[in-house]
Amino acid sequence: MTNIRVAIVGYGNLGRSVEKLIAKQPDMDLVGIFSRRATLDTKTPVFDVADVDKHADDVDVLFLCMGSATDIPEQAPKFAQFACTVDTYDNHRDIPRHRQVMNEAATAAGNVALVSTGWDPGMFSINRVYAAAVLAEHQQHTFWGPGLSQGHSDALRRIPGVQKAVQYTLPSEDALEKARRGEAGDLTGKQTHKRQCFVVADAADHERIENDIRTMPDYFVGYEVEVNFIDEATFDSEHTGMPHGGHVITTGDTGGFNHTVEYILKLDRNPDFTASSQIAFGRAAHRMKQQGQSGAFTVLEVAPYLLSPENLDDLIARDV
């Protein structure tokens, strides 16, 4: 069987992780990386992102390793014209619209576009649906962390005077236990998570910066917030990793008997796990096209066996 020919669009943290992990796949060959930059620190062939159409006959799947704020919404439909695509679009509220736009582009080209892969959306999405379907009368809560929030960290770094900063999202242990007991029905996201900030800044700016953090709407207002000012050496030695994870907890009653389904992720490096998920769904996208399908699909619409490099008979014999 011929290997799946894949390429990467974008070369940030996620793109580098995808590149590294494709080398571990038994059924994929990396054709190249499409970038706006002329040169990259890699041995993989680099092509101008404007020339994707010139390589359409050489690529089966494009891994779109771009930002969700503007890049994916604006550019992903164009890429779906030339190959199957897999993205990690994570604006939850806008996923239905994104799926519709990608469906139009992919269907017109006869390709498959898998949208919003990763872990949330992605693996957490699948678990939410499975657990809720099994427990018809249920409470369900998603907790994020402990882990680095890239969006909130970026917000900290935009504050004048901040030299370096990271923000960790921490789930409330009390809220976790309430969720496991089925007693967290009235808790909001702001009550279930804590924002922990580590900031490098001149001492004269500390008071103003802390006030700016605590009063920042959409990011910190309403949350329990902890602000820690540290020196640059401590920051560089202790706060340059990218851990993350979380819990999906579903509790339900089946006529007097209580049940709990808890799905946990503990990730040493967020981009690597997100890339691993994206790659598995890339395999599925290629197989779905081979089966004659086209259009856009979420992770909920993909048969699990399509993700695995192993054949279905072996999976059934071992895992069912």
From Swiss-Prot:
So where does this one cross the membrane? none
Biological process annotations from GO = diaminopimelate biosynthetic process; lysine biosynthetic process via diaminopimelate
The UniProt record gives the binding positions of substrate as D90, D120, W144, Q150, G151, T169, R195, H244, N270
**Influence of pH:** Optimum pH is about 9.8 for the oxidative deamination of meso-diaminopimelate and 7.9 for the reductive amination of L-2-amino-6-oxopimelate.
Amino-acid positions noted as binding NADP(+) in the UniProt annotation, renumbered to this chain? 11-14, 35-37, 65-68, 88-90, 117-121
Keywords, alphabetical: Amino-acid biosynthesis, Diaminopimelate biosynthesis, Lysine biosynthesis, NADP, Oxidoreductase
Pfam families given for it? DAPDH_C (PF16654)
Q: What class of enzyme is it?
A: oxidoreductase
Catalytic function, reaction form: meso-2,6-diaminopimelate + NADP(+) + H2O = (S)-2-amino-6-oxoheptanedioate + NH4(+) + NADPH + H(+)
Instruction: Output the Gene Ontology terms for molecular function.
Output: diaminopimelate dehydrogenase activity
Cleavable signal peptide: none
Q: What is its EC number?
A: 1.4.1.16
How is this protein's activity controlled?
Answer: The enzyme is also inhibited by L-cysteine, and by p-chloromercuribenzoate, iodoacetic acid and HgCl(2) in vitro.
Entries under Gene3D superfamilies matching the protein: Dihydrodipicolinate Reductase, domain 2, NAD(P)-binding Rossmann-like Domain
Q: Give the source's domain of life in one word.
A: Bacteria
Pathway, per Swiss-Prot/TrEMBL?
Answer: Amino-acid biosynthesis; L-lysine biosynthesis via DAP pathway; DL-2,6-diaminopimelate from (S)-tetrahydrodipicolinate: step 1/1
Alphabetical list of NCBIfam families matching this protein: DAP-DH
Please quote what the entry notes about the protein's domains: Is composed of three domains: a dinucleotide binding domain, a dimerization domain, and a substrate-binding domain.
* Record's function text: Probably plays a role in lysine biosynthesis.
Subunit notes for this chain?
A: Homodimer.
What's the family?
A: Belongs to the diaminopimelate dehydrogenase family.
Name assigned to this protein: Meso-diaminopimelate D-dehydrogenase
Q: Which organism is it from?
A: Corynebacterium glutamicum (strain ATCC 13032 / DSM 20300 / JCM 1318 / BCRC 11384 / CCUG 27702 / LMG 3730 / NBRC 12168 / NCIMB 10025 / NRRL B-2784 / 534)
